[in-house]
């Protein structure tokens, strides 16, 4: 594996399939005294989910935080919106709704 591929998987978050808890390496795990910046692969073998006590095998990789959602091969489709992060998509959607609302309210000013 290349150095870039190894670096990308280090900061990946993992989600518990049982309860939905997300292990974020940037934060670590205070309940089990896991230091921040500890990758999921370096957690002890006996580490369990702090919420439901599921084993490490019950976790799935959901990728790093702040990246575009969806499959990487699908990010090139559409009008470029697929490359936006979920927060950027929220701003785009609700910003457009607010502008539309203001436009229709401004029609009351016409005589």
UniProtKB/Swiss-Prot annotation:
Cofactor: binding details: Binds 1 Fe(3+) ion per subunit.
Q: Where is the Rubredoxin-like domain?
A: 11-62
Q: What does this protein do?
A: Rubredoxin is a small nonheme, iron protein lacking acid-labile sulfide. Its single Fe, chelated to 4 Cys, functions as an electron acceptor and may also stabilize the conformation of the molecule. Could be involved in hydrogenase-linked redox processes.
GO biological process, any: alkane catabolic process
Q: Which cofactor does it need?
A: Fe(3+)
* Protein name (database record): Rubredoxin
Pfam families named in the record: Rubredoxin
Q: Does the keyword Magnesium apply?
A: no
GO molecular-function term, one example from the UniProt record:
electron transfer activity
Binding positions (Fe cation):
16, 19, 49, 52
Top-rank taxon: Bacteria
Similarity comment: Belongs to the rubredoxin family.
- Keyword annotations for this protein? Electron transport, Iron, Metal-binding, Transport
